[in-house]
Amino acid sequence: MNRRILSTVEELDSILRELDSVAETSDDELRRLFMTFSMEYPVNAEKDPYSHEYKTAQSALYERLSGKPYTPANEESAFDVGEAVFQPFPYLTKSPRTVGNHIIAVGNVIRHIQSPPPSTILEFGPGWGNTTLMLARMGYQVTAVDIEKRFIELIQKRAAQKSVEIECIHGDFSFISDTSRKWDTILFFECFHHCFEHQELISWLDGVVNEGGQVIFAAEPITDLFPVPWGFRLDGESLRAIRKFGWCELGFQEGYFRDLLHRHGWSVKRTDFTDTPVGTVFTATRLSDQNSGRTPTSLEGSEASRSKCQ
């Protein structure tokens, strides 16, 4: 498939107008068209991913693409809560492929949770609440934190439908920066890449995870194929999300991601599951917990280890 390399936001706007009309009729066709265009990274990018200059350059790139400065308040999603109660994503797409891939991915995430119910789970960015509801129905004590009020309202209504309890908190990733609470599992499922201040977020994790606990990063764009250590993704789908909605759409090189976690005392294991395009899971456990034998689960391993679920 030939891919068009865009160089201006005017070119991007022209394509997005075409995509808007396609989105009204076919989710599958929309996703296919995402693969037909992208942008390229500047060749003279700042090299140190922990430097102020690097972060400033990424902020400037975002402003160029979105037309405004980034703030977590940009992460809003407009939808009808009443309709979504009965037909949330992925069902609203009416795409067998999209629905199937999502359901498989959710199941893959759940089987990586090492502590059985009624242990505690903090889920960031639960969105439509599909994983949240499944965990609550299993008997987990789930805390769901989302910056979008409509998602919080949706999860509350869906929980009431199933007669399950879910603690819903309207907030952003900084919620864990000043809480005294701890959880057995922290879950990021397709949401960690929405955190521009991700280095700060990683520094907070140690204070909110119980001994022997874990942090799960599922279906996140973490790959050494990414052209820079971390930054805004410039593929078609990400460009649309940044330009049209103002969302933060980061990508990460795996080496950088592992180094960042290791700097804060975490070991990382990668598990690939190829039956869905969003099947890769990174599980972080404390180095100190591993050394003391406090992580009894078959899914764990050394920092550099990788495995495949069959």
Model-inferred region functions:
Residues 199-211:
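A short glycine-rich, Lys/Arg-flanked "PGG" loop and its adjoining helix->strand segment in the class I
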Residues 118-127:
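Conserved class I S-adenosyl-L-methionine
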Residues 1-104, 231-244, 281-310:
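N-terminal accessory regions of S-adenosyl-L-methionine
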